[in-house]
Amino acid sequence: MDWETLKADCLACSRCELCKTRTNVVFGQGVPDAEVLFVGEGPGQSEDEQGLPFVGRSGQLLDKYLFAIDLDREKNCYIANIVKCRPPQNRDPLPAESEACMPWLREQFRLLRPKIVVCLGRIAAQRMIRSDFSVTKEHGQFMEKNGILFMGPSTRPPCCAARRTSPMPLPTLWLCGTRSTKCVSIPMNESSSPSAHFVRIHLPRRGEVLAA
């Protein structure tokens, strides 16, 4: 299946009850040969209205992070979600909804063949890395699966950070660049400057925690 066929089929999806309440299917956004894949939980209100992932305040925050490490959803990365339709009232996707939607993400994964997968939030990490993944115990760690580096959320997804009205001085977000050789620590604070110091590193070993 190619990208065009996959997207057309996904936009017509009726595999779960979310199809009855959605405005738009949020298929994903990015380049078809991206080495870095970001996976979120699911669309929010703004995403449901526009049909694109991470376009509200959380999207603006995420774009700051991407810009700081030379990533751009229009040029060299891809953004998708576990579920393609917005759960009502932005609740967590039900297990049945996630399971019904995962084949779409698996096909995107197969077409992309990314080198690095960054999970944006607990639910994404538990679906992509391991069902018992613990953000508290395993945040910011790289884990290798079948030659692909998976990274769990370092603190919380951008949608949570964007809703904060007070600064978040301590938590940081680790993202890895497209060449797999540079990482940057960016404050999880929407008011912070996106410019940050780049740190050259080697590929992390299995389970290695990257620290400043």
Q: Positions of the model-derived regions?
A:
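Glycine-biased, low-complexity coil/linker segments
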Residues: 206-207
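A polyanion-binding, active-site-adjacent surface
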Residues: 1-198, 212
